[in-house]
């Protein structure tokens, strides 16, 4: 099982890139991008708490005496990105759009700040695993800041392409996370200790992440097309026709 939802080789990072991680959370993608190539990695989120966690985690990965790469994080909304047009070479938006009512406006903002020919990697919960969670627990999607919709991947692709993108790849991720969320929804508790099945499966996920045994990596790879929790898509921003304004 991988910590990352986005596969970085599909982003095609090159030295000097500027990358935006929109809704970076605790920094898993923004920090990894910083470590992979001499780029400027920018992470934004609405949660000050998550950004503080990102700062703390980054100290473990900071590369001293290397001015060719940087990580910048700040509070900002995807509905009004504080960046000029055509600022970024790559944009990541992982597990974010399902939290936003007006997600199409966020996609339009991503298109605005991404350079022509730039790559946009995004993920949302896959329809069936998410549908089961909603059926098992109302509280799952009624919590403050929770999921406001279940996406149909084909419809979402159409929305993104209408904004001026072309999809070039797709895969699924985190199949081993699905039983955890189904158990959590089945034994939902608003407060206090989680039910035993939830605790034990969480321990398994942590062990798997830290130990990375070949068996579970193989299982995750085999099961992802069938029941991966996330659907991940990669798009390129179309260049404007000759003579049009960028």
Label every model-predicted segment.
Residues 1-84, 90-94, 104-107, 199-206, ...:
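Conserved N-terminal segment of class I S-adenosyl-L-methionine
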Residues 95-99:
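A short His-aromatic
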Residues 104-119:
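A short glycine-rich, Lys/Arg-flanked "PGG" loop and its adjoining helix->strand segment in the class I
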Residues 123-124, 173:
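Alpha/beta-hydrolase-fold catalytic nucleophile elbow
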Residues 125-149, 157-159:
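Short, glycine-/aromatic-enriched active-site segment of Class I SAM-dependent methyltransferases
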Residues 154-171:
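A SAM-dependent methyltransferase catalytic signature shared across enzymes that methylate proteins
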Residues 169-209, 229-230:
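Conserved catalytic loop of SAM-dependent methyltransferase domains
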